[in-house]
A protein has these predicted regions:
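Alpha-helical scaffold elements adjacent to nucleotide-binding pockets in ATP/GTP-utilizing enzyme cores
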Residues: 1, 27-35, 67-74, 96-104, ...
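AAA+ P-loop NTPase catalytic core and its hallmark functional loops
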Residues: 110, 371-374, 390-391, 447, ...
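Short, polar/flexible loop-turn hinges at active-site or ligand-entry regions and domain interfaces
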Residues: 8-13, 37-58, 75-92, 103-118, ...
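P-loop NTPase Walker
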Residues: 1-80, 312, 316-322, 330, ...
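Helicase-core coupling region on the C-terminal RecA-like lobe
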Residues: 125-138, 144, 152, 423-515
Length: 515
């Protein structure tokens, strides 16, 4: 973005730079200011650069919440909120939530609300109702990361609605997920059995044991072939395991190892079947139908809490951090006649204002923020910076998949004339040995299934700084990755603690671990 100001001559107040923290915003301002001053030193007559010093004071370099708050303050009259609204502090907001939930529960008790009493019987331990209160507030907080919380929760609860309990359960999303999970377990065990049989065939003495393994494979393959429908899977879920032969004359070590592997497979399959295929379709559908009734009541209670909480905030002229994003979304996004999301007139004003939009730490954005920033962009003027490996805010409903979707879709080829991806793989903070170790670990543990990204040589970190060669450093650790394992687990056993201390002392005196 600095080059946009200096090289492309874009006024700094025509650029929106969204950072994750206020500190990052301040740092960005300083970096831009330093870069401008450096250019002025080289080109003291450049009036355009001097102009940027003045414009920097009103430049939009801020967090997403600061930007949204600015949108709200400039258009509060569209939201039916007073001009003197304020953002409530965390403690005040939490106390208000507790007041609202207490009042709501008290009213439900007084009215002997049947749906409410059913929820009490389902989610509490009969001593108090705190667990249900906590559940309502937790779900309420969770759905605020959705652009449209009410629609989201109604859609999710509707997934539990069963129209005909006689339909095969595999037709539901729940049945599909469970059968897919069981199928993966069965496939894994079949591969293990086939590999085991291949090894055992090297020994003629293991022929009768091989027959058992082959029978196991046949039984599991039969189950796998019947996992296309629920009732078919249920009817074939009784695996007939052959008895393992006992022959003391066979002393080959692989025999005992094979039995251990087989026992582990039997345990895994039995556990998977008992977790998944508990009932036939009708019974499973009945369970989901009963769950729908309960979840629908829970949804209604959450939405009622949401409405009351919103009313209480209006009474006190306060908004919270979730309101900041949702009010901005309300001002910037609307649905057309076909239900498609489009930019409002207010959003179009911001489109005209900003020539470029830059988003830092994009991997930690949520869907509300995505809709907001997309609504004010021209479509091809957003610059996103992120690293999915640094995504640590999923518990706050960050959506790293937004980053991954673009990472997979965008091209590194400028000539293709479409959305461009620039890979930043040079690391300026670490020496080569640290990078080698990091690449080694990530290469082995990060896959599409675990970590959402395939960490291969195209993703490796590369040395970017010029460090002094290890041979010139007078240290035993030069060029070596020293791996220190710190066990923070508390242990009440004094004897074990003493043993652990001795072990740590020994490790500290040993040579570093070379990797």
């Amino acid at each position: 973005m600095i080059s946009k100001v200096i090289k492309d001559k874009i006024d700094i107040d025509k650029i929106l730079i969204v950072t994750f923290t206020n500190a990052a915003a301040s740092e960005m301002r300083e970096r831009i200011l330093d870069a401008i001053y450096k250019q002025i030193d080289e080109n003291p007559e450049d009036e355009a650069l001097q102009k940027q010093i003045i414009l920097l004071n009103k430049a939009s370099i801020c967090t997403i919440h600061s930007f949204c708050l600015d949108v709200i303050r400039n258009h509060f009259y569209e939201l039916d909120i007073p001009a003197n609204f304020r953002v409530g502090d965390t403690g005040e907001i939490e106390l208000l939530k507790q007041d609202v939930i207490e009042e709501l529960f008290e009213e439900k008790y007084l009215n002997n609300d049947k749906e409410f009493i059913k929820l009490i019987n389902t989610y509490t331990n009969y001593r108090d109702d705190e667990s249900l209160k906590e559940l309502i507030i937790t779900i309420y907080k969770f759905i605020q990361s959705s652009p449209f919380p009410k629609e989201w929760i109604e859609e999710k609860v509707k997934m539990f609605k069963i129209d005909d309990i006689t339909d095969d359960f595999s037709g539901t999303i729940w049945g599909k997920i469970l059968l897919e999970s069981l199928s993966e377990d069965v496939k894994d065990c079949i591969i293990r059995l086939e590999n085991l049989a291949k090894e055992m065939k090297k020994f003629d003495e293991l022929e009768k044991y091989i027959k058992v393994i082959q029978n196991d494979t046949y039984e599991l393959q039969s189950l796998l072939n019947n996992l296309n429908t629920w009732d078919s899977a249920y009817n074939h879920s009784n695996i007939e395991w052959m008895k393992w032969p006992v022959d003391r004359k066979v002393t080959i070590e692989l025999k005992d190892e094979a039995k251990k592997i087989r026992d582990d497979i039997k345990k895994k399959i039995s556990s998977s079947i008992n977790k998944v295929l508990l009932y036939n379709s009708e019974a499973a559908n009945n369970d989901i139908k009963e769950m729908y009734s309960i979840l629908n009541s829970l949804k209604n209670l959450i939405l009622e809490f949401s409405d009351r909480f919103k009313y209480k905030k209006r009474e006190k002229n306060i908004i919270d951090f979730n309101d900041i994003e949702h009010f901005a979304l309300e001002l910037l996004v609307k649905k057309d006649d076909k239900g498609n999301l489009i930019s409002t007139e207010i959003a179009n004003e911001y489109k005209e204002k900003f020539e470029e939009i830059a988003i830092d730490e994009y991997q930690d954005s949520n869907l509300v923020q995505e809709y907001i920033l997309r609504s004010i962009s021209k479509g091809n003027n957003i610059f996103m910076v992120g690293d999915v490996k640094q995504s640590i805010y999923k518990f706050r409903q960050a959506r790293p998949e937004l980053f991954l979707e673009k990472y997979e879709k965008y091209s590194i080829d400028k000539e293709q004339g479409r959305d461009l991806k620039i890979k930043l793989f040079k690391n300026f903070r670490s020496r080569q040995n640290i990078l080698d170790f990091t690449n080694l670990v990530f290469d082995n543990i990060m896959t599409k299934e675990i970590g959402d990204i395939l960490y291969d040589k195209d993703e490796y970190l590369n040395l970017g700084a010029n460090y002094e060669p290890p041979e010139n450093i007078k240290s035993v650790y030069a060029g070596i990755t020293n791996l220190e394992i710190i066990d923070l687990k508390e242990d009440d056993d004094d004897e074990e603690e003493n043993d652990s201390s001795k072990s740590i002392e020994k490790n500290e005196s040993d040579e570093p671990i070379v990797l």
